[in-house]
């Protein structure tokens, strides 16, 4: 049983989603958005750090998963996104959480089945997978998608490790 915090970083809106992985089941614990004010970037980064730190304190996750930076058309936007990611990652590292990063296409593939999915498809599938009563906010749904991607990746790695151990045992008997 592990608790996973997923983050969809942004300099103005950072989505978060928290799930518990119990065997093959994923249980929704919470989600939302950290909305920064129209202050200068350094103060927004401070708000992201404080918000993520508060979420970590509230939910006590075992793992921290975050979406990787994609190449934006606007270099300034990509740099600000990278700084927002950095603020969130520092909060996780300060809490001594392991940090995992996933590409947006991999997250969409894990949640929807195609890396080219749009936001509404991710929202719909997150709602279905976690049995939510309504559609989550877009940024929160993306963050829950990051957490789901990590849970699925983690399950696959554990299964592969178990198969490798079984194969080794069989071979050396």
Curated annotation (Swiss-Prot):
The gene is ruvC. It comes from Vibrio cholerae serotype O1 (strain ATCC 39315 / El Tor Inaba N16961). The lineage of its organism: Bacteria, Pseudomonadati, Pseudomonadota, Gammaproteobacteria, Vibrionales. Coiled coil: none annotated. The active site is at 8, 67, 139. Mg(2+) 1 binds at residues 8, 139. One of its GO terms (biological process) is DNA recombination. This is Crossover junction endodeoxyribonuclease RuvC. Its cofactor is Mg(2+). It catalyses: Endonucleolytic cleavage at a junction such as a reciprocal single-stranded crossover between two homologous DNA duplexes (Holliday junction). Its main location: cytoplasm.
């Amino acid at each position: 049983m592990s608790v996973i915090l997923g983050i969809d970083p942004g300099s103005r809106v950072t989505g978060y989603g928290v799930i518990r992985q119990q065997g093959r089941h994923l249980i929704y614990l919470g989600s939302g958005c950290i909305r920064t004010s129209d202050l200068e970037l350094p103060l927004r980064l401070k708000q992201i750090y404080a918000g993520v730190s508060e979420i970590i304190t509230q939910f006590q996750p075992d793992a921290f998963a975050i979406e990787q930076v994609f190449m934006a058309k606007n270099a300034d936007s990509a740099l600000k996104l990278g700084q927002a990611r950095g603020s969130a990652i520092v909060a996780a590292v300060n809490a001594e959480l392991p940090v995992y990063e996933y590409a947006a296409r991999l997250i969409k593939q894990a949640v929807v089945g195609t890396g080219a999915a749009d936001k509404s498809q991710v929202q719909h599938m997150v709602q279905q997978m976690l049995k939510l009563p309504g559609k989550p906010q877009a940024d929160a749904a993306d963050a829950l998608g990051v957490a789901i991607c990590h849970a699925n990746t983690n399950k696959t790695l554990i299964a592969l490790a178990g198969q490798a151990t079984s194969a080794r045992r069989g071979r050396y008997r």
